[in-house]
Amino acid sequence: MAIQLPGFTMKNPLMPASGTFGFGEGYAKEYDLNLLGALVTKSTTLAPRIGNQGTIFADGPDSTLNAVGLKNPGSDVVLHEKLPWLATQYPDLPIIASIAGVDVAEYAAVAKKLSAAPNVKALEVNISCPNVKQGGMAFGTDPEVAAAVTRAVKAASSVPIFVKLTPNVTDITAIAKAVEQAGADGLSLINTFVGMRLDIATGKPLLDNVTGGVSGPALLPMALHMVYQVAHAVRVPLIGMGGISSGHDAAEMLAAGATALAVGSANYYQKRAIPKIAAELAAIQEGQTVL
Protein backbone atom coordinates (compact mmCIF):
# COMPACT_ATOMS: atom_id res chain seq x y z
CA MET A 1 0.00 0.00 0.00
CA ALA A 2 1.73 3.14 -1.23
CA ILE A 3 1.65 6.16 1.09
CA GLN A 4 2.05 9.77 -0.01
CA LEU A 5 3.70 12.13 2.46
CA PRO A 6 4.84 15.70 1.81
CA GLY A 7 7.87 15.47 -0.46
CA PHE A 8 7.93 11.73 -1.16
CA THR A 9 6.06 8.47 -1.64
CA MET A 10 6.50 5.33 0.48
CA LYS A 11 5.90 1.86 -0.95
CA ASN A 12 4.42 0.85 2.41
CA PRO A 13 3.63 2.84 5.59
CA LEU A 14 6.46 1.49 7.76
CA MET A 15 9.80 3.01 8.75
CA PRO A 16 12.18 2.66 11.71
CA ALA A 17 11.83 5.20 14.48
CA SER A 18 14.85 7.44 14.87
CA GLY A 19 17.47 6.20 17.29
CA THR A 20 16.59 2.51 17.10
CA PHE A 21 18.08 1.85 13.67
CA GLY A 22 21.23 3.97 13.58
CA PHE A 23 21.89 4.78 9.94
CA GLY A 24 20.88 1.33 8.75
CA GLU A 25 24.27 -0.37 8.44
CA GLY A 26 23.65 -3.04 11.07
CA TYR A 27 20.19 -3.94 9.84
CA ALA A 28 21.37 -4.03 6.20
CA LYS A 29 23.18 -7.24 7.17
CA GLU A 30 19.85 -8.77 8.24
CA TYR A 31 17.56 -7.87 5.32
CA ASP A 32 17.15 -5.69 2.23
CA LEU A 33 16.40 -2.18 3.46
CA ASN A 34 14.38 -1.61 0.30
CA LEU A 35 11.63 -3.45 2.19
CA LEU A 36 11.20 -0.29 4.27
CA GLY A 37 8.79 2.43 3.25
CA ALA A 38 11.38 5.00 4.35
CA LEU A 39 14.36 5.20 6.70
CA VAL A 40 14.61 7.68 9.56
CA THR A 41 18.19 8.32 10.64
CA LYS A 42 19.52 8.69 14.16
CA SER A 43 19.04 12.24 15.45
CA THR A 44 22.01 14.33 14.36
CA THR A 45 23.47 17.43 15.99
CA LEU A 46 25.89 19.95 14.50
CA ALA A 47 28.93 18.50 16.30
CA PRO A 48 29.43 14.90 17.47
CA ARG A 49 27.91 13.89 20.81
CA ILE A 50 29.25 11.07 22.96
CA GLY A 51 25.91 10.72 24.74
CA ASN A 52 25.36 9.62 28.31
CA GLN A 53 27.87 7.33 29.99
CA GLY A 54 27.49 4.35 32.30
CA THR A 55 24.36 2.19 32.30
CA ILE A 56 22.01 3.54 29.62
CA PHE A 57 19.55 0.65 29.13
CA ALA A 58 17.20 -1.23 31.47
CA ASP A 59 14.72 -3.80 30.19
CA GLY A 60 11.37 -4.60 31.77
CA PRO A 61 8.76 -7.26 30.90
CA ASP A 62 6.94 -5.05 28.39
CA SER A 63 9.08 -1.94 28.12
CA THR A 64 12.61 -0.68 27.62
CA LEU A 65 14.20 2.25 29.43
CA ASN A 66 17.00 4.11 27.65
CA ALA A 67 19.15 7.15 28.33
CA VAL A 68 21.40 7.17 25.26
CA GLY A 69 21.54 10.96 25.25
CA LEU A 70 21.50 11.68 21.50
CA LYS A 71 24.83 9.99 20.82
CA ASN A 72 25.69 10.66 17.17
CA PRO A 73 28.71 11.26 14.89
CA GLY A 74 27.80 14.86 14.04
CA SER A 75 26.48 16.54 10.92
CA ASP A 76 29.73 16.42 8.90
CA VAL A 77 30.04 12.64 9.17
CA VAL A 78 26.34 12.17 8.46
CA LEU A 79 26.43 14.47 5.41
CA HIS A 80 29.65 13.14 3.91
CA GLU A 81 29.60 9.47 4.95
CA LYS A 82 26.28 8.11 6.26
CA LEU A 83 23.90 9.70 3.75
CA PRO A 84 26.11 8.99 0.69
CA TRP A 85 26.34 5.33 1.76
CA LEU A 86 22.56 5.11 1.89
CA ALA A 87 22.27 6.88 -1.48
CA THR A 88 24.68 4.42 -3.08
CA GLN A 89 23.22 1.28 -1.56
CA TYR A 90 19.53 2.27 -1.62
CA PRO A 91 19.02 5.01 -4.22
CA ASP A 92 15.23 4.63 -4.22
CA LEU A 93 14.76 4.56 -0.43
CA PRO A 94 13.36 7.85 0.95
CA ILE A 95 15.49 9.15 3.81
CA ILE A 96 14.11 11.26 6.66
CA ALA A 97 17.00 12.91 8.49
CA SER A 98 16.31 13.43 12.18
CA ILE A 99 17.89 16.57 13.63
CA ALA A 100 18.41 17.92 17.15
CA GLY A 101 20.14 20.81 18.85
CA VAL A 102 20.79 22.69 22.08
CA ASP A 103 19.29 25.93 20.77
CA VAL A 104 17.22 27.25 17.87
CA ALA A 105 20.31 28.30 15.92
CA GLU A 106 21.74 24.78 16.01
CA TYR A 107 18.49 23.25 14.80
CA ALA A 108 18.46 25.68 11.87
CA ALA A 109 22.10 25.05 11.01
CA VAL A 110 21.70 21.27 10.97
CA ALA A 111 18.48 21.59 8.97
CA LYS A 112 20.17 23.68 6.28
CA LYS A 113 23.09 21.27 6.09
CA LEU A 114 21.30 17.93 5.96
CA SER A 115 18.34 19.01 3.84
CA ALA A 116 20.83 19.68 1.03
CA ALA A 117 21.64 15.96 0.71
CA PRO A 118 20.01 14.62 -2.49
CA ASN A 119 18.46 11.55 -0.85
CA VAL A 120 16.99 13.40 2.14
CA LYS A 121 13.32 13.82 1.33
CA ALA A 122 12.25 15.29 4.68
CA LEU A 123 13.56 16.26 8.11
CA GLU A 124 12.28 15.06 11.45
CA VAL A 125 12.74 17.77 14.08
CA ASN A 126 13.41 16.06 17.40
CA ILE A 127 12.14 18.46 20.07
CA SER A 128 11.23 15.61 22.39
CA CYS A 129 14.30 13.67 23.57
CA PRO A 130 13.98 13.22 27.37
CA ASN A 131 17.59 12.18 27.98
CA VAL A 132 19.67 15.33 27.47
CA LYS A 133 20.41 18.19 29.84
CA GLN A 134 20.19 20.93 27.18
CA GLY A 135 17.62 21.17 24.40
CA GLY A 136 15.69 18.02 23.66
CA MET A 137 12.34 17.79 25.43
CA ALA A 138 12.66 21.36 26.74
CA PHE A 139 11.78 22.55 23.24
CA GLY A 140 8.74 20.32 23.00
CA THR A 141 6.83 21.14 26.18
CA ASP A 142 6.11 24.83 25.53
CA PRO A 143 3.97 25.73 22.50
CA GLU A 144 5.76 29.04 21.86
CA VAL A 145 9.23 27.52 22.05
CA ALA A 146 8.20 24.56 19.89
CA ALA A 147 6.80 26.99 17.33
CA ALA A 148 10.01 29.04 17.35
CA VAL A 149 12.13 25.98 16.57
CA THR A 150 9.68 24.94 13.85
CA ARG A 151 9.76 28.35 12.17
CA ALA A 152 13.57 28.42 12.19
CA VAL A 153 13.89 24.92 10.76
CA LYS A 154 11.21 25.56 8.15
CA ALA A 155 13.06 28.67 6.97
CA ALA A 156 16.39 26.84 6.80
CA SER A 157 15.23 23.57 5.24
CA SER A 158 14.87 22.85 1.54
CA VAL A 159 12.65 19.81 2.22
CA PRO A 160 9.41 19.24 4.19
CA ILE A 161 9.70 19.01 7.98
CA PHE A 162 8.01 16.67 10.47
CA VAL A 163 8.11 17.77 14.11
CA LYS A 164 8.46 14.96 16.66
CA LEU A 165 6.25 15.50 19.71
CA THR A 166 6.82 14.53 23.32
CA PRO A 167 4.05 12.80 25.30
CA ASN A 168 5.35 14.41 28.51
CA VAL A 169 2.86 17.29 28.40
CA THR A 170 -0.59 18.01 29.78
CA ASP A 171 -2.12 18.72 26.36
CA ILE A 172 -0.30 17.37 23.32
CA THR A 173 -2.80 18.99 20.96
CA ALA A 174 -1.65 22.46 22.06
CA ILE A 175 1.90 21.66 20.93
CA ALA A 176 0.63 20.03 17.74
CA LYS A 177 -1.44 23.06 16.78
CA ALA A 178 1.41 25.44 17.56
CA VAL A 179 3.94 23.69 15.33
CA GLU A 180 1.38 23.20 12.57
CA GLN A 181 0.70 26.94 12.55
CA ALA A 182 4.47 27.57 12.57
CA GLY A 183 4.88 25.65 9.32
CA ALA A 184 5.31 21.96 10.11
CA ASP A 185 4.44 19.81 7.09
CA GLY A 186 3.71 16.83 9.32
CA LEU A 187 4.07 15.49 12.86
CA SER A 188 5.73 12.42 14.38
CA LEU A 189 4.35 11.07 17.64
CA ILE A 190 4.93 9.93 20.22
CA ASN A 191 8.46 9.98 21.57
CA THR A 192 9.19 8.19 24.85
CA PHE A 193 7.72 8.86 28.28
CA VAL A 194 10.07 9.84 31.09
CA GLY A 195 10.51 7.00 33.57
CA MET A 196 12.90 5.18 35.85
CA ARG A 197 13.68 1.77 37.33
CA LEU A 198 15.40 1.01 40.63
CA ASP A 199 17.63 -1.69 42.03
CA ILE A 200 15.64 -2.93 45.03
CA ALA A 201 18.82 -4.20 46.71
CA THR A 202 20.43 -0.75 46.79
CA GLY A 203 17.47 1.57 46.30
CA LYS A 204 19.41 3.32 43.54
CA PRO A 205 18.25 4.02 39.98
CA LEU A 206 19.31 1.43 37.41
CA LEU A 207 20.35 4.16 34.98
CA ASP A 208 23.31 6.41 35.71
CA ASN A 209 21.24 9.23 34.22
CA VAL A 210 18.55 8.38 36.87
CA THR A 211 15.70 8.73 34.37
CA GLY A 212 15.28 7.59 30.79
CA GLY A 213 12.80 7.26 27.99
CA VAL A 214 10.25 4.45 28.28
CA SER A 215 9.40 2.62 25.07
CA GLY A 216 7.99 -0.74 24.06
CA PRO A 217 4.59 -2.49 23.91
CA ALA A 218 3.40 -0.89 27.17
CA LEU A 219 3.21 2.48 25.38
CA LEU A 220 0.75 1.45 22.68
CA PRO A 221 -2.55 2.45 24.39
CA MET A 222 -1.19 5.89 25.32
CA ALA A 223 0.31 6.38 21.88
CA LEU A 224 -2.97 5.46 20.20
CA HIS A 225 -4.85 7.93 22.38
CA MET A 226 -2.46 10.79 21.63
CA VAL A 227 -2.38 10.08 17.89
CA TYR A 228 -6.18 10.00 17.93
CA GLN A 229 -6.31 13.34 19.77
CA VAL A 230 -3.83 15.03 17.46
CA ALA A 231 -5.44 13.61 14.31
CA HIS A 232 -8.64 15.39 15.31
CA ALA A 233 -6.81 18.65 16.09
CA VAL A 234 -4.60 19.23 13.02
CA ARG A 235 -4.75 18.80 9.26
CA VAL A 236 -1.14 17.74 8.53
CA PRO A 237 -0.23 14.04 8.18
CA LEU A 238 0.96 12.07 11.20
CA ILE A 239 3.70 9.47 11.54
CA GLY A 240 2.40 7.34 14.41
CA MET A 241 4.70 5.46 16.76
CA GLY A 242 4.87 4.08 20.28
CA GLY A 243 4.64 0.38 21.13
CA ILE A 244 4.04 -1.01 17.63
CA SER A 245 5.25 -4.61 17.49
CA SER A 246 2.73 -6.42 15.27
CA GLY A 247 0.56 -5.94 12.22
CA HIS A 248 -2.46 -5.60 14.52
CA ASP A 249 -0.75 -2.78 16.42
CA ALA A 250 0.06 -1.10 13.10
CA ALA A 251 -3.53 -1.39 11.90
CA GLU A 252 -4.75 0.15 15.16
CA MET A 253 -2.36 3.08 14.77
CA LEU A 254 -3.61 3.73 11.24
CA ALA A 255 -7.19 3.55 12.52
CA ALA A 256 -6.30 6.13 15.19
CA GLY A 257 -5.39 8.61 12.46
CA ALA A 258 -1.77 8.02 11.49
CA THR A 259 -0.84 8.21 7.82
CA ALA A 260 2.46 6.37 8.24
CA LEU A 261 4.09 4.36 11.02
CA ALA A 262 7.45 4.15 12.78
CA VAL A 263 8.69 1.10 14.67
CA GLY A 264 11.15 1.63 17.50
CA SER A 265 12.13 -0.76 20.27
CA ALA A 266 10.71 -3.79 18.44
CA ASN A 267 13.85 -3.57 16.29
CA TYR A 268 15.93 -4.40 19.37
CA TYR A 269 13.98 -7.57 20.11
CA GLN A 270 13.72 -8.82 16.53
CA LYS A 271 16.05 -7.65 13.78
CA ARG A 272 13.43 -8.30 11.08
CA ALA A 273 10.60 -6.64 13.00
CA ILE A 274 9.66 -4.13 10.31
CA PRO A 275 9.37 -6.60 7.39
CA LYS A 276 7.38 -8.91 9.68
CA ILE A 277 5.00 -6.12 10.73
CA ALA A 278 4.65 -4.92 7.13
CA ALA A 279 3.69 -8.42 5.97
CA GLU A 280 1.18 -8.83 8.80
CA LEU A 281 -0.34 -5.42 8.11
CA ALA A 282 -0.68 -6.17 4.40
CA ALA A 283 -2.44 -9.44 5.22
CA ILE A 284 -4.85 -7.67 7.59
CA GLN A 285 -5.63 -5.06 4.96
CA GLU A 286 -6.33 -7.83 2.46
CA GLY A 287 -8.76 -9.47 4.87
CA GLN A 288 -6.57 -12.40 5.83
CA THR A 289 -6.27 -13.88 9.30
CA VAL A 290 -2.94 -13.17 10.98
CA LEU A 291 -1.88 -15.57 13.74
UniProtKB/Swiss-Prot annotation:
Chief location of this protein within or outside the cell: cytoplasm
InterPro entries xref list: Aldolase_TIM (IPR013785), DHO_dehydrogenase (IPR050074), DHOD_1B (IPR033888), Dihydroorotate_DH_1 (IPR024920), Dihydroorotate_DH_1_2 (IPR012135), Dihydroorotate_DH_cat (IPR005720), Dihydroorotate_DH_CS (IPR001295), Dihydroorotate_DH_I (IPR049622)
Reaction catalysed by this enzyme: (S)-dihydroorotate + fumarate = orotate + succinate
Cofactor names: FMN
Active site: 129
Annotated GO CC locations: cytoplasm
Enzyme class: oxidoreductase
Residues involved in FMN binding: 18, 42-43, 126, 164, 190, 216, 242-243, 264-265
Family membership noted in the UniProt record: Belongs to the dihydroorotate dehydrogenase family. Type 1 subfamily.
Function of the protein: Catalyzes the conversion of dihydroorotate to orotate with fumarate as the electron acceptor.
Protein name per UniProt: Dihydroorotate dehydrogenase A (fumarate)
Gene it is expressed from: pyrD
